[in-house]
């Protein structure tokens, strides 16, 4: 299946205005990178540092910013738009919608749906899924194979739960959310009280509340709150294998890469990013627009927007061990330097 360039631009015109330069009847067979694109492919240039690849690309058409218009026109057809990366993201959505066959709503006969559950029109439920009493599934939602939806839960309209997703009792998922395979929403938070050498379980009585347009990666876990709910606001994006502890609150449109972890009762602001493998310790607060580099450990609250890194740089092992040994002596070296500065100051005063 192909798409005409004119059809692509026209379909996206209600969202983003773009200028099509070249033959509008060119048929696009595939979306591709500049490097791999062939003569029937559509690609994009999102950053000026890749400008050299533009001239070498065999793509039938390239989405570019106004600054790259002249270079793009000199090689062939192009779509000129203010934000090429955003526009290309919209093209991928259009492409999937046009090319991926959407099955008609269907409830598999092996699925268990409690009579006290409420399913709106257009809901699909896959094989061996379980939907418990009191649960509400919104219109057009898709619940894939082996999903388990607990009692009194809520899955919003047009949300998609992939295979083997668990949504525990009382948890809420908003509209148009995407939850990838194996994610667990609403398992007990990690709460225990020490008593006479033993750990006494603190029952987790809160839930998880997830806003609209949230995407949750495969095998990500979001724990239910102890007393208050764990909350993900609208537009949050979590990669695979992310751990969100109990009572955490994550602001709108914050994104976290794979293997990031947020300990209990931390508050993450809106429009933040947390790099892969980074850790935010419990009970800390991050302001809006805070960006944490990969593998960093956040040990204090960050109240000022900006980009933060807490990571010992990689090096060959011998050099790393020497630097690590020096770092352990940093306080001693600091005190020696202060003493040397004081002695030098005394000598200068006497002279």
Swiss-Prot record:
Recorded hits in Pfam families, A to Z, give:
Hexapep, LpxD
Tell me a Gene Ontology molecular-function term this record carries. Answer: N-acyltransferase activity
Record-given protein name: UDP-3-O-acylglucosamine N-acyltransferase
Gene name, per UniProt, is lpxD
Task: Name the EC number(s).
Answer: 2.3.1.191
Its Gene Ontology cellular component terms are:
membrane
> What functional role does this protein have?
Catalyzes the N-acylation of UDP-3-O-acylglucosamine using 3-hydroxyacyl-ACP as the acyl donor. Is involved in the biosynthesis of lipid A, a phosphorylated glycolipid that anchors the lipopolysaccharide to the outer membrane of the cell.
Q: Which GO terms describe its biological process?
A: lipid A biosynthetic process
What organism is this sequence from?
Polaromonas sp. (strain JS666 / ATCC BAA-500)
Q: Identify the CDD domains for this entry.
A: LbH_LpxD
Lineage, top ranks: Bacteria, Pseudomonadati, Pseudomonadota, Betaproteobacteria, Burkholderiales
User: Under which pathway is this protein filed?
Assistant: Bacterial outer membrane biogenesis; LPS lipid A biosynthesis
Enzyme type, top EC level = transferase
Sorted UniProt keywords: Acyltransferase, Lipid A biosynthesis, Lipid biosynthesis, Lipid metabolism, Repeat, Transferase
Family listed: Belongs to the transferase hexapeptide repeat family. LpxD subfamily.
Q: How does it assemble?
A: Homotrimer.
Catalytic residues (UniProt): 246
Q: Which reaction does it catalyse?
A: a UDP-3-O-[(3R)-3-hydroxyacyl]-alpha-D-glucosamine + a (3R)-hydroxyacyl-[ACP] = a UDP-2-N,3-O-bis[(3R)-3-hydroxyacyl]-alpha-D-glucosamine + holo-[ACP] + H(+)
């Amino acid at each position: 299946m192909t798409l005409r360039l004119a059809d692509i631009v026209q379909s996206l015109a209600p969202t983003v205005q773009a200028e099509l330069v070249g033959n509008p009847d060119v048929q696009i067979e595939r979306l591709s990178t500049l490097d791999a694109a062939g003569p029937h492919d559509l690609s994009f240039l999102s950053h000026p540092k890749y400008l050299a690849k533009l001239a070498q690309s065999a793509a039938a058409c390239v989405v570019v910013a106004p600054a790259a218009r002249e270079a793009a026109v000199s090689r062939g057809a192009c779509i000129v738009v203010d934000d090429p990366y955003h526009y290309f993201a919209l093209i991928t959505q259009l492409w999937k919608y046009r090319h991926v066959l959407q099955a008609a709503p269907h409830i598999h006969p092996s699925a268990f749906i409690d009579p006290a559950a409420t399913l709106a029109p257009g809901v699909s439920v896959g094989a061996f899924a379980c939907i418990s009493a009191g649960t509400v599934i919104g219109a057009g939602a898709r619940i894939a194979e082996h999903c388990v939806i607990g009692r009194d839960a809520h899955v919003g309209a047009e949300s998609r739960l992939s295979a083997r997703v668990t949504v525990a009792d009382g948890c809420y998922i908003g509209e148009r959310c995407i939850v990838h395979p194996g994610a667990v929403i609403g398992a007990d938070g990690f709460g225990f009280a020490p008593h006479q050498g033993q750990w006494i379980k603190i029952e987790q009585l809160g839930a998880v509340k997830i806003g609209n347009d949230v995407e949750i990666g495969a095998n990500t876990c979001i724990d239910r709150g102890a007393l208050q709910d764990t909350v993900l606001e609208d537009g949050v994006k979590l990669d695979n294998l992310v751990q969100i502890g109990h009572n955490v609150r994550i602001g709108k449109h914050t994104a976290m890469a794979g293997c990031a972890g947020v300990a209990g009762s931390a508050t993450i602001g809106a429009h933040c990013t947390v790099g892969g493998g980074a850790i935010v310790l419990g009970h800390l607060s991050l302001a809006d627009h805070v960006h944490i580099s990969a593998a960093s450990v956040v040990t204090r609250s960050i109240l000022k927007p900006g980009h933060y890194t807490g990571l010992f740089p990689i090096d060959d092992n011998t050099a790393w061990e020497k630097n690590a040994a020096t770092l352990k002596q940093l306080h001693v070296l600091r005190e020696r330097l202060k003493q040397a500065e004081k002695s030098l100051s005394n000598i200068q005063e006497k002279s």
